[in-house]
Amino acid sequence: EEVQDLYSKLQELQNMEEPLEPNSWGTLWLGCLVTILGGNWNEIYCRGHIINFSLEDGILSIETETAWGEMDEVRHFIEKVYPALKIYYYEEECGCEIYQTNDRHGHFFSSRYIFDDQDGEGMEYFDKPETLLAFASRAMGKKLETIEDLNDAVDDSEGFSFHEIKVVND
């Protein structure tokens, strides 16, 4: 099965003493993954590394840390090597205000909103606007009935931020 094969290759990389390719990220650098899958890391943008992966009930989860965004070239390469696999991702790059997923139906990444109470609960993720608005109303101490109300309240305050998670085609 393709999922098991990819998982085995990730384990192989993780257990290596030295990376397949020289780099400053270690054995789980995305370039090493591209190499072990038969690709050329010089032709695929690989700026990042895998920080965690697990296989449970036939679902392979891979968490990466990358620079400036989701590594779509690596993702597309993996899908080319394993045509039966579909990779769903969630990308969060706070400094660039990027919050997006390709999981249109929310099977793996169902959250569509983030509320950040920097002095309280921290970042909270929400699937539905009603739940978000109820939480934000309590945190901000004011009644918020719409997303527009929330945007206005966040604009007028310090210590709170709000982000909608964009669903992208890919």
Residue ranges and their predicted role:
Residues 1-170:
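Intrinsic low-complexity, intrinsically disordered or marginally ordered coil/linker segments
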